[in-house]
UniProtKB/Swiss-Prot annotation:
Keyword Phosphoprotein part of the UniProt annotation: no
HAMAP family, A to Z: Cys_tRNA_synth
Protein name per Swiss-Prot or TrEMBL: Cysteine--tRNA ligase
Quaternary data: Monomer.
Cofactor(s) in the UniProt record: Zn(2+)
Cofactor note: Binds 1 zinc ion per subunit.
Recorded name of the encoding gene: cysS
Localization (cell): Cytoplasm
Source organism: Thermosipho melanesiensis (strain DSM 12029 / CIP 104789 / BI429)
EC number: 6.1.1.16
Length: 469
C-alpha cells in the first residue's frame, strides 16, 4: 500500500514518493507571534502534527520544520503599542504558543527556526537573486523580486501572470516595476528594528524568510511544504518562485494546504476580529473536543465554527471519554491484547483511510464505532473483546491522531534485584502450595507493569516495552 496526498500544485491526488527513501522532509508555516493563537491558527498545527505521526507510524523518519515569524509589521506595531522591544513581544508569544501547543497535545517539530536568527543567510540569498537578475534594488533601499523574470510564476496557485491583479495580500508601491513584485528586503523606517545589508539598514521581507529557513534545514529540494490555503497566494507562490530562482532546482515536491475555519461567513482572522483563542477553547470544551472538531472534517475542506457546534462536539467527545473511563474503572491496568483477525482488519481500515489523502473523518467514524462496541463488550462481560477496542481507540488511532490517547499504566522500576527477590519469595510460596498469596503477588506485579509467566522452565518476567510514557 502507498500513501496518497493531494498536491496543490498539480491539483491531483499523488503517490507520496520521498526524495530519500524512508525519509520525509516537511516544512509547515508557523505563526507570526504577535498575539495568542486562535482556532484557525491551530488547524494546520493539529492536522500536520497528526500527519507527521501517521508517517512515523508507517515507518518513515520525518524531519519536520515549523517556523516562527518573529519580525513583522504586526509585531512592530504591537511592540510600539506596549512601549517595548519587538523581541519582547515575539518572546512572549512564542512562550504562549508553547503553552497552547502543550495543552492541545501538539508535538514539537524537529526544528523551530526564528526569522531573526537567519538574517545573515537571508541577506546572502537576496544578494544571489540580485546577481542572477531575479531581483532589483529600489531607490529607497528596498529590494524586490521581479516576477516577470520567473517564467513559472503562478504555477502553484494556478494563476497566469497577466491575469493576476495586485490585491488583498499584495503590497502596492510606486517603487516596484510591477505591482506583483514582492519585497525581499525592506528599507528601515523610523522606529523600526533593522539589520545591516549592502543596500542599507532594513529587515527581511515576509516570503524570503521561509525559503531560506526551509532550505537551510531541509536542503534545496525537500518533500512537503504545508500550511493554510490562505497562504497559497501570494506567500507560497512567492516562496516557490524565489527558491527555484535561487537554486535552479525544484523547491517542494508536494504542497499540502488545509481549509480555513469559517465563522459567520468569514475566515477566522485576528484582523477581522472574529477569533476564538485556543486557550479559551480548551478551557471551555476540553482538548479532545477541540481536536475532534479540527479532525472531524477532511483537512482540505473549510470548517464552520460556532459555539453551538463546539458544544455538540464536546458532548460527542465526552461520550468517548466516558466509555474509556468506564473501561479503566472496570479494568484498571489494561495490557496489550493479543492480535487477531478483528484487530488486523480494523487497523487495515484505519491505514486505508489515512493513506487516502489523510482522511481523518473516516477514522473518527471508526473511533465512534469502536466506542459503541466497547460499551457492548463491557455490558456482556467480554474483557478481551473490550480490551481490543480500548487498545485500538487509545493506543493506535488515538496515538496517531493525538486524540483520546492513553498509555499503559506502569509503575516504573529499573531495579531488577527487587523484582527478582519478590519472585523468589513467590516461588517459595508456590512450593508450599500457597497459591492464593502467590497469585496476589503476581497480580500486584502486573499492576506495576511487570508481566510474569510461569513456565515448565521456571518463572520468567519482563517489563512491557510498549508503554507510552
Amino acid at each position: 500500500m502507498a500513501i496518497y496526498i493531494t498536491n496543490t500544485e498539480s491539483g491531483k491526488k499523488e503517490k507520496l514518493v520521498p526524495n530519500t527513501p524512508g525519509v520525509v522532509k516537511m516544512y509547515v508555516c508557523g505563526p507570526t507571534v504577535y498575539n495568542y493563537i486562535h482556532i484557525g491558527n491551530a488547524r494546520p498545527a493539529v492536522v500536520f502534527d497528526a500527519f507527521r505521526r501517521f508517517l512515523e507510524y508507517r515507518g518513515y523518519k520525518v524531519v519536520m520544520v515549523q517556523n516562527f515569524t518573529d519580525i513583522d509589521d504586526k509585531i512592530i506595531n504591537e511592540a510600539n503599542a506596549w512601549g517595548v522591544n519587538f523581541k519582547d513581544v515575539a518572546d512572549t508569544f512564542i512562550a504562549e504558543y508553547w503553552k497552547d501547543a502543550e495543552n492541545l497535545g501538539i508535538r514539537a517539530a524537529n526544528f523551530h527556526p526564528r526569522t531573526t536568527d537567519y538574517v545573515k543567510e537571508i541577506v546572502e540569498a537576496v544578494e544571489k537573486l540580485i546577481a542572477k537578475n531575479y531581483a532589483y534594488v529600489a531607490d529607497n533601499g528596498d529590494v524586490y523580486f521581479s516576477v516577470k523574470e520567473f517564467k513559472d510564476y503562478g504555477k502553484l496557485s494556478g494563476k497566469k501572470l497577466e491575469d493576476l491583479v495586485a490585491g488583498a495580500r499584495v503590497e502596492v508601491s510606486e517603487l516596484k516595476k510591477n505591482p506583483l513584485d514582492f519585497a525581499l528586503w525592506k528599507a528601515v523606517k523610523p522606529g523600526e528594528p533593522s539589520w545591516d545589508s549592502p543596500w542599507g539598514n532594513g529587515r527581511p521581507g515576509w516570503h524570503i524568510e521561509c525559503s531560506v529557513m526551509s532550505q537551510r534545514l531541509l536542503g534545496d529540494s525537500f518533500d512537503i511544504h504545508a500550511g493554510g490555503e490562505d497562504l497559497i497566494f501570494p506567500h507560497h507562490e512567492d516562496e516557490k518562485a524565489q527558491s527555484e530562482a535561487l537554486t535552479g532546482k525544484p523547491f517542494a515536491k508536494y504542497w499540502m494546504h488545509n481549509g480555513m475555519i469559517i465563522t459567520r461567513g468569514d475566515k477566522m482572522s485576528k484582523s477581522i476580529g472574529n477569533v476564538f483563542l485556543v486557550r479559551e477553547a480548551v478551557k471551555r470544551y476540553g482538548k479532545d473536543a477541540v481536536k475532534l472538531f479540527l479532525l472531524s472534517k477532511h483537512y482540505r475542506t473549510p470548517i464552520e465554527f460556532s459555539h453551538e457546534i463546539m458544544f455538540n462536539t464536546k458532548k460527542a467527545a465526552l461520550r468517548i471519554l466516558n466509555t474509556l473511563n468506564r473501561f479503566e474503572e472496570k479494568y484498571p491496568y489494561p495490557l496489550v491484547p493479543k492480535r487477531d483477525t478483528f484487530m488486523n482488519d480494523m487497523e487495515a481500515r484505519f491505514v486505508e483511510a489515512l493513506e487516502d489523502d489523510f482522511n481523518t473523518p473516516r477514522v473518527i467514524a471508526l473511533i465512534f464505532e469502536l466506542s459503541k462496541d466497547l460499551n457492548k463488550a463491557m455490558d456482556e462481560g467480554k474483557e478481551e473483546e473490550a480490551l481490543k477496542r480500548y487498545h485500538l481507540i487509545t493506543r493506535v488511532f488515538g496515538s496517531v491522531l493525538g486524540i483520546f490517547e492513553r498509555g499503559l499504566k506502569v509503575v516504573e522500576t529499573n531495579n531488577q534485584k527487587i523484582i527478582e527477590e519478590i519472585l523468589s519469595v513467590r516461588q517459595e510460596l508456590r512450593k508450599e502450595k500457597d497459591y492464593n498469596v502467590a497469585d496476589k503477588i503476581r497480580d500486584a506485579l502486573l499492576r506495576a507493569g511487570v508481566k510474569i509467566l510461569d513456565t515448565s522452565e521456571g518463572t520468567k518476567w519482563e517489563m512491557n516495552t510498549e508503554v507510552d510514557e
